[in-house]
């Protein structure tokens, strides 16, 4: 199971770097110690490793991977990546002021109230005008969802989560003081939703 998840995450990482302008995270840094990206629940780091390989602007820049202690203990070291034990359900985000916080396929596992809790644990780390949250999830269309999205929705309903339409995602984000800047659809079913703190 862990191996299949790792493979899926690696393939997804390749899709992400082709769609979202991650190179912008490595530009105009105020300090060489500034953290450009935090991968929340990032497993063994397949997505970050792919970014290091394909986004030249991130080479030599500091990134952080967070996951549960057992996962972090078993990690293979990655250059320029710090591994930090973190439970996004119970603890406030410990890495403050990063350029971006990546939550990929995290929120679909949980009902709305837990999604809000995860986001509220992340928000204190954001610096207004600098930090953003990148949510990678399936956005179901208003009608006739693709078969993969529909199957995922049915599967996750057993756990209280599931796929959501754009208006449902927006409602969750706005309820905790976040707003969508832009949605970046990938070639597959996922979309990257770029969030920032509300301007007012």
PLM features: what roles do these ranges have?
Residues 1-145, 180-181, 185, 191:
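Conserved adenosyl
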Residues 130, 134-176, 181:
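C-terminal alpha-helical "lid/dimerization" subdomain adjacent to the S-adenosyl-L-methionine
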Residues 193-200:
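C-terminal lobe and adjacent flexible extensions of AdoMet/dcAdoMet transferase-like proteins
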């Amino acid at each position: 199971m862990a191996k299949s998840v790792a493979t899926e995450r690696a393939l997804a990482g390749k899709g992400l770097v082709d769609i979202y302008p991650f190179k912008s995270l490595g530009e105009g840094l105020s300090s060489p110690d500034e953290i450009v990206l935090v991968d929340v629940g990032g497993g063994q780091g397949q997505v970050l490793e792919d970014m290091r390989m394909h986004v030249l602007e991130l080479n030599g820049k500091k990134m952080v991977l967070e996951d549960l202690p057992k996962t972090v203990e078993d990690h293979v070291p990655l250059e320029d990546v710090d591994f930090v034990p973190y439970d996004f359900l119970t603890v406030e985000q410990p890495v403050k002021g990063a350029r971006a916080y990546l939550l990929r396929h995290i929120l679909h596992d949980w009902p709305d109230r837990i999604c809000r809790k995860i986001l509220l644990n992340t928000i204190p780390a954001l610096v207004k005008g600098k930090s953003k949250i990148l949510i990678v999830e399936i956005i179901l269309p208003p009608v006739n969802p693709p078969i993969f999205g529909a199957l995922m929705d049915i599967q996750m309903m057993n756990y209280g989560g599931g796929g959501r339409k754009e208006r449902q995602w927006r409602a969750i984000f706005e309820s905790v003081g976040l707003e969508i800047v832009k949605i970046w659809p990938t070639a597959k079913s996922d979309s990257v939703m770029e969030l920032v703190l509300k301007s007012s």
